[in-house]
Amino acid sequence: MKIEVSIGEILDKISILEIKKNKIKDKEKLKNINNEFNTLVESYPSYIDQLEYKDLLKINSLLWDIEDRLRLKEKNKKFDEEFIRLARDVYFTNDKRSVIKKKINIRLGSDLIEEKSYEDYS
């Protein structure tokens, strides 16, 4: 089955798969990751060099690190100030990620544009 999604969503997915290729060592998982990565990159090769893609790669790498640190805190049952800061960093960083994806969709003329709406916390 195939489904249409925005260009920003595809580039976001490709950037996450690129991170997984570098972080995950399990050979069975890597087979699936590489298959999905290669399939998506074949469909959108010219977009990988875009500056916004590099921004997504950077922000998704940051999210990966935040989530890893959060899970370690959870594992150790350390729900301290740093845990709270990291938990908040997840949604602050995801908000930035959403802005990048929308910019990609608008700049590249995506037919689909994802919209987000959250309570203003500023």
Describe every region a protein language model picked out.
Residues M1-S122:
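Extended, charge-rich alpha-helical interface modules
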